[in-house]
């Protein structure tokens, strides 16, 4: 099973999300920055690497938020792991997306997210009242 890691980066009450480019898989869908874990790589290390590649930042992972399995039609199951990133060196730059956007948490459901992220978005937005630090 492929493991995919994603970063929830919040600043000033907004969350950083990226929109995929039009020519690849799942064109123009929104997602949290991150990517696939390579063989023999730990998930946290993969996320640090992916954030450097996609955003040009050196991130410090604060902890895992949640994980679950998902299967896109006709594809193998994947394990999605979402991490909270509270600090990073550098200013996020768009090195890999069609566009980057800082979005208020309550506005996330209005974006056309990857199917694999939709349940997390609902859960994350619903947590605000119960767990304001996540």
What residue spans do the PLM features occupy?
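Conserved N-terminal beta-strand and adjoining loop/helix that marks the start
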Residues: 1-16, 36
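Active-site-adjacent beta-strand/loop module that shapes the phosphate/pyrophosphate-binding cleft
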Residues: 2, 58-59, 68-91, 101, ...
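Short secondary-structure boundary/capping segments
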Residues: 7-8, 22, 72, 91-94
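Conserved Nudix-box catalytic region and its N-terminal flanking loop in Nudix hydrolases
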Residues: 14-53, 57
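NUDIX/MutT-family hydrolases
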Residues: 84, 93-124
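Generic C-terminal helix-cap and adjacent flexible tail
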Residues: 125-134
């Amino acid at each position: 099973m492929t493991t995919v890691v994603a970063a929830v980066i919040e600043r000033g009450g907004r969350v950083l999300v990226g929109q995929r480019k039009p020519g690849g898989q799942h064109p123009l869908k929104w997602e949290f920055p991150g990517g696939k874990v390579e063989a023999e790589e730990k998930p946290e290390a993969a996320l640090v690497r992916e954030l450097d590649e996609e955003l040009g930042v050196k991130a410090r992972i604060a902890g895992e938020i949640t994980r679950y399995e998902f299967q896109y039609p006709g594809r193998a199951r994947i394990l999605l792991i979402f991490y909270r990133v509270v600090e990073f060196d550098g200013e996020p730059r768009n090195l890999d997306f069609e566009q980057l956007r800082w979005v208020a948490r309550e506005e996330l459901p209005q974006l056309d997210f990857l199917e694999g992220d939709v349940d997390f978005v609902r859960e994350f937005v619903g947590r605000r009242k119960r767990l304001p630090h996540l």
